[in-house]
């Protein structure tokens, strides 16, 4: 009997479908459920704002723990199962604001690592799949689109139908959430996040021990066999073959301790050009939070029926799926800079449209505006994940991905808090008009920098290793020239931190 195994890429597709389906059966309906539990709109807004704030602080920590322990799959599964237990038991919580808020915050603390760790695994699995199948057209977006299918095409409409037909079935969203997130937790254990470590025990194997920049922790790195010595020494802490390319190096011992992971991650994400890009991601997330939190309130004041709100969610996924499917071609055609500019421009048109709905005379004009969600979220998330992947060395990708997810959460927090204050004072139409003006200013500054040859997205990852060049098509290139070195000891006299980064980026 033929022994068949499920390709890892299929686990990723199934995970996004199940996970986003789990979100769809509960998250869009939570404000309505909280309202039925006698929470005021301001209290609901506080809960909505605090959730992303917890994510901003906790998600990078989960990423660092995963990179330090290398237990990405187990941590991923734990976060999902913790979220299932937390939100599942929320139904039985006393209907008091303080208890509900505390319950949600504890749940988010332990469950906020579910999403970005899946993105980390998907990027790795897609890369390995393309190495084995160079002609494959698979990409991150073609995997991620299954989340939009699960959210908008299947589970959100299905739960809406259940709640419409069974008005007393308030437990249904919580029960469905527990079932789907438990399934996602089981799938997470099958997802790969990194190469399995292989110890070369050959006779020619050599172990080089290097101290970090504070001399506190030692790293052991297995390097090429002694035969490579005759072909040249390793520049910048590595070995260079006859063709000038670095020979492979593999870890044979544990990674640096947690403090070192945190410090290296901090250096990477706070490098000025990289941090500027993360700030732009934060502003995009702020605009997204304004839409997610206040669009339906604005539609309600315009007399929109509930069915229109459901169709608005459906239309977002209609546009999101093709964008995710073609995201690789879009990024290759536009580059990361122009892709980010396109996102800001799409927000301008989307928010101006929301502000003008009253002038249009009907809230139903919101439906064509929702098609821009494919750019404002689909392309935004794809660019953010791609930038994080290219910015980080392989052993820090989950940590950097967690920082991107954390900045997204901080933007959502600011959008919920600031947007609520503006909404209370001037209303939904003026709120979206002000946001459109802000995005117009950002777009003009962005375009001017590009026009004068100033790339906003950094083209060289100088923090990790200067040989890594991130071009605007989303590819990683190795520079042809490497500083010559006759022996490993020559490289050992260089700055310890530079050696560490060079080694880490090639593993």
Enumerate the language-model features and the residues they cover.
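Helix-to-loop junctions at the C-terminal end of transmembrane segments
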Residues: 57-71, 162-164, 322-336, 423-424
């Amino acid at each position: 009997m033929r022994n068949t195994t499920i390709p890892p890429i299929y686990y990723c597709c199934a995970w996004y479908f199940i996970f986003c389906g789990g979100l769809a059966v509960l998250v869009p309906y939570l404000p309505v459920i909280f309202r039925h539990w006698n929470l005021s709109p301001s209290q609901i807004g506080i809960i909505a704002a605090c959730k992303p704030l917890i994510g901003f602080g906790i998600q990078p920590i989960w990423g660092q723990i995963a990179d330090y322990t290398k237990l990405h799959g187990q941590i991923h599964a734990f976060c999902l199962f913790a979220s299932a237990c937390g939100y599942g038991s929320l139904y039985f919580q006393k209907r008091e604001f303080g208890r509900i808020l505390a319950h949600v915050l504890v749940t988010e603390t332990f469950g906020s690592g579910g999403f970005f760790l899946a993105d980390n695994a998907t990027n790795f699995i897609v890369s390995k799949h393309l190495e084995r199948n160079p002609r494959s057209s698979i990409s991150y977006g073609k995997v991620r689109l299954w989340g939009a299918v699960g959210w908008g095409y299947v589970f959100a409409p299905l739960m809406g139908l259940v709640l419409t037909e069974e008005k007393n079935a308030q437990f249904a969203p919580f029960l469905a959430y527990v079932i789907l997130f438990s399934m996602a937790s089981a799938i997470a254990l099958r997802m790969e996040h990194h190469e399995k470590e292989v110890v070369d025990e050959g006779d020619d194997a050599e172990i080089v021990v290097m101290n970090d920049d504070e001399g506190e922790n030692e790293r052991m790195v297995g390097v090429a066999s002694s035969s490579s010595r005759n072909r040249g020494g390793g520049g910048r802490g590595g070995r260079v073959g006859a063709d000038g390319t670095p020979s492979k190096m593999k870890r044979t011992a544990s990674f640096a301790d947690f403090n070192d992971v945190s410090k290296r991650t901090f250096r990477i994400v706070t490098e000025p050009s990289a941090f500027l890009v993360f700030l732009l991601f934060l502003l995009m997330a702020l605009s997204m939070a304004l839409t997610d939190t206040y669009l339906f309130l604005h539609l309600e004041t315009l007399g929109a029926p509930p069915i229109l709100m459901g169709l608005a969610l459906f239309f977002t996924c209609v546009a999101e799926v093709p964008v995710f499917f073609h995201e690789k071609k879009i990024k290759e055609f536009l580059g990361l800079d122009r892709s980010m500019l396109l996102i800001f421009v799409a927000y301008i048109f989307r928010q101006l449209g929301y502000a003008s709905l009253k002038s249009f005379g009907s809230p139903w004009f919101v439906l064509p505006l929702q098609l821009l969600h494919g750019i404002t979220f689909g392309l935004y998330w794809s660019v953010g994940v791609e930038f994080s992947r290219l910015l980080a060395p392989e052993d820090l990708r989950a940590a950097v991905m967690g920082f991107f997810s954390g900045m997204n959460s901080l933007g959502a927090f600011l959008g919920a808090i600031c947007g609520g204050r503006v909404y209370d004072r001037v209303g939904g139409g003026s709120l979206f008009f002000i946001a459109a003006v802000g995005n117009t200013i950002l777009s003009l500054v962005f375009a001017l920098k590009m026009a004068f040859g100033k790339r906003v997205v950094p083209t060289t990852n100088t923090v990790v290793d200067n040989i890594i060049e991130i071009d605007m098509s989303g590819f990683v290139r190795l520079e042809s020239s490497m500083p010559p070195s006759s022996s490993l000891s020559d490289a050992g006299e260089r700055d310890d931190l530079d050696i560490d980064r060079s080694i880490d980026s090639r593993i």
